């Protein structure tokens, strides 16, 4: 072998160089695959796991619960029989990205509408607190005869869906929720009218870094 190397030094050097180049290319290819897998994993971790049908269906179902509540309040006086009414009502509203991020944090992995129906009702009941209270006063007519006067007080408190995660989610779930909210699940096209699209996507605050870019 030593004699062969002495007789063909240039050829041996070329062969050695080829081996080194092949090894280098294999190493680079392996590194690129690892980087690609890591990038795909990071993107997947920040993207809503469910199909559009489930996401849009969940939003529509929640909006339906809100519509029922609004109708109940709008027709309250015509469907009740009290003498006097006092209303103190917060606005009925929610942000769809907050809702979907909450559902995706509560249900790890892909979920369907039927799987989150219970969570939708739970979130709705926590967000909206409706209180109805009736007081009865004794009044007197022109003949000084007593009669009962019924006064109904209706209060609706909107706890704000975005305030629920702190008391509702575990530490791990809170981490997922925060990531989904910061990226909007990588789906700013789903609910373009949401103010969060402008806040995080269109005009992100100075110094803000998208977790999906890590």
Residue ranges and their predicted role:
Residues 1-214:
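Membrane-proximal envelope biogenesis segments
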